[in-house]
């Protein structure tokens, strides 16, 4: 018997280290149904097998009690949303309260006394159980900022602790599964330092949704990508940096969920001819036909935009952008989604969060690649692959250019580049210049050298592409995506500045048709931040970043170092979703005493009395 238990334990350990049991957390907004025509989405339009957790955004608050935003939510949308669990009994649903437009004042009032918090908690349990939700998501943007007093940082912790205590007590009394508790948090370092005690949040919450997007947008004077996977060492604005920062501060990796947007941020260019990354911008581009927000396009709107646009790929950020005339959009597509999914698996994070499910191409009518083309990629890599008996899809994936460490060994990047690629039609077929063919099981070695989150550095030499069992010297820049065709923009081999490539015949070629700019004196990227809840109708910029523009469209990473990680690729299957095993196993945690206060210096002091006062000055409202 003990041998059987030992074997089962070993299997579970190996499964954990293989990255299994990833969460795919998807938000659905209660204003999705109000979009016109084919963009109007109701809960019954959603695929219940795509995500492990669905979160309904948002509930509101009245008189320190959680309430539905309107009667339609409670009478129609809540029941329809939770009815999805009849089709997938492993699906978990949560109700989120807050959001950008919600502000902070009602949170502050509710948090201010123990009696107010008790009243709120009782209303939460009642509402969740009445409508068959499995948990609560706290979307408080942000404790200690935007008009919230500094002591909200600690009263927010008290609320979370008291919610968890009440959820456990209710579960014991009713013999029902305990209600889940999650929170959406900023990925921007100065907001994290002001608003959160990371270790306590990591101990108490079931999972933490890191908002690792909205890192650049039309509130800035130069173009930048909304959600780059990686960035240069001097620039903390990337998804990888945000996730590593939370982990460095003590949050458990398995509880950290990386936020990924199904929308793009747009800019209006000063000059149509100056249309690269860090090009001068004069504001937001035109609103989308369905979302109707300047500076913002849902993915299903981006599919229409890129038909007549020129599409580009940012090699060191692993994300695309497109421009048409004076309009510019940075966004995520199926390729960048796959890179982000593999980054999550490789780094053993808890999973991915999608904002939002309803901004993907829900019915497959806009992009021509089937329903949910973005979220399907994430599901395929994070959820379905874990239970598949076939070999997992793999490809070369570089490590992060930047990390949360300031170790100079890990910040040895002085150059970066981008490479333009041809437009990819929504049908999934790649536009190529000479070669047009579908390549599967292709291994790509990126032409850059970059810094890893660990201290491992590897310099790449030749550009190689492995097809099956063969390895060849490439004569072109080759890209492949899961379910997409490969592209060969030209017949000449392009070599980054500072590297040489040996081709047959011992000829050495350097890049043709690309400008390379050495940023040895450091390239400064925007350091401002605009905090929003994407998709809401009022977006308020916080602060105005200052940037030093880089006047190029393409730069070369000759001095970068990189640790390649070997994976394989496979073609995406169609959107027939297979049932999955149990999605989540929640750990038991020890609840600390409610009579504590955590100071900014990390000291723990006892609190007395029911009311909380603080002598700490209010932090400037820099968002």
Curated annotation (Swiss-Prot):
Residues recorded as binding chitin, renumbered to this chain, are 71-72, 98-101, 142, 211-214, 355
The listed locations are:
Cytoplasmic vesicle, Secretory vesicle
Q: Mind telling me which PROSITE patterns this protein's record contains?
A: GH18_2
Q: In which tissues is it expressed?
A: Oviduct.
Biological process GO terms, please?
Answer: carbohydrate metabolic process; chitin catabolic process; single fertilization
What InterPro entries does the record tag this protein with?
Answer: Chitinase_II/V-like_cat, Chitinase_insertion_sf, Glyco_hydro18_cat, Glycoside_hydrolase_SF, Glycosyl_Hydrlase_18
The record's GO CC annotations read: extracellular region; transport vesicle
Q: Where is the signal peptide?
A: 1-21
The GO molecular function terms of this record are: chitin binding; chitinase activity
List the keywords (alphabetical): Cytoplasmic vesicle, Disulfide bond, Fertilization, Glycoprotein, Signal
Q: In which residue ranges is the amino acid composition biased (Polar residues)?
A: 613-623
Please indicate which superkingdom the organism of origin belongs to: Eukaryota
> Which residues are noted as glycosylation sites?
402, 441
Please state every residue range assigned to the domain named GH18.
22-385
- Does the entry annotate any disulfide bonds, and if so which pairs? 26-51
Q: Where is this region: Disordered?
A: 539-558, 594-623
What does the sequence similarity comment in the record state about its family? Belongs to the glycosyl hydrolase 18 family.
- Quote the function comment for this protein: Binds to oocyte zona pellucida in vivo. May play a role in the fertilization process and/or early embryonic development.
Q: What protein name applies here?
A: Oviduct-specific glycoprotein
From what organism does this protein derive?
A: Papio anubis (Olive baboon)
Q: What is the lineage of its organism?
A: Eukaryota, Metazoa, Chordata, Craniata, Vertebrata
Q: What's the encoding gene here?
A: OVGP1
